[in-house]
């Protein structure tokens, strides 16, 4: 078996990062499902900041809407932060994993760069568990700070009806019910024409 050298480990880490980037890029190219042939019912979508702890609020609204409007389909998901923050958080995640793997495998990235190994890196090598825990928690803190948007966005049939980012507050159930009633009042069901030739 070939001995693992620093160069081989670096190539392995590079391949893992490239694979992660390819998987990430493939996930964005999904084609949305069309609504043709489906029973079209009103659909309410909640996009919320998962790292802010708004999932519980989403579940409460789902329960309220299920009682009052059982015909409405309710979907929910994470609100991805706009702009550069999302990509920076992904880069911090990859960097965190690379550093932890380097510490655990006792590979010094400074030797690849032709630099002397700093004393703090040697200290990390001597205290691997402590160093890995600190890297993990600091990385998570930075990621959470970058992706926490404070969003709680509500759309009904792809029409925005409430934005916590704009109003600064959650809608009360009464306000949400009034918005839904007003929206459903204007949407009329398509009546089949008996004279239409099929």
UniProtKB/Swiss-Prot annotation:
Keywords: Disulfide bond, NADP, Oxidoreductase, Redox-active center, Signal
Keyword Ubl conjugation: no
Disulfide bridge map: 49-52
Source species, domain of life: Eukaryota
Biological processes, Gene Ontology terms: cell redox homeostasis
Matching InterPro entries: Selenoprotein_Rdx-typ, Selenoprotein_T, Thioredoxin-like_sf
Top-level enzyme category: oxidoreductase
Catalysed reactions listed for this entry: [thioredoxin]-dithiol + NADP(+) = [thioredoxin]-disulfide + NADPH + H(+)
Signal peptide: 1-25
A GO molecular function held by the record: thioredoxin-disulfide reductase (NADPH) activity
Assigned GO CC terms: endomembrane system; endoplasmic reticulum membrane
EC numbers for this chain: 1.8.1.9
Role, per record: Probably has thioredoxin reductase-like oxidoreductase activity.
Similarity remark: Belongs to the SelWTH family. SELT subfamily.
Protein name: Thioredoxin reductase-like selenoprotein T homolog CG3887
Organism: Drosophila melanogaster (Fruit fly)
């Amino acid at each position: 078996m070939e001995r693992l050298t620093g160069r081989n480990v670096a190539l392995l880490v590079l391949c893992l990062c490239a694979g992660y980037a390819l998987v990430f890029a493939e996930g964005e190219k999904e084609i949305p499902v069309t609504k043709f042939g489906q029973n079209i019912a009103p659909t309410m979508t909640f996009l919320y900041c998962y790292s802010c702890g708004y999932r519980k609020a989403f579940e409460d609204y789902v329960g309220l809407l299920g009682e009052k409007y059982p015909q409405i389909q309710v979907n929910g998901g994470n609100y991805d932060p706009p702009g550069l923050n999302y990509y920076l958080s992904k880069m911090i995640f990859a960097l965190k994993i690379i550093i932890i793997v380097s510490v655990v495998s006792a590979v010094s990235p400074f030797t690849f760069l032709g630099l002397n190994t700093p004393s703090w890196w040697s200290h990390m090598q001597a205290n691997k568990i402590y160093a890995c825990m600190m890297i993990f928690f600091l990385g998570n803190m930075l990621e959470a700070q970058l992706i926490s948007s404070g969003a709680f966005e509500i759309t009904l049939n792809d029409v925005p009806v409430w934005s916590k980012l704009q109003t600064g507050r959650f809608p009360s159930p009464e306000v949400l019910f009034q918005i839904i009633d007003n929206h459903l009042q204007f949407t009329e069901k398509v009546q089949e024409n008996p004279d239409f030739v099929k």
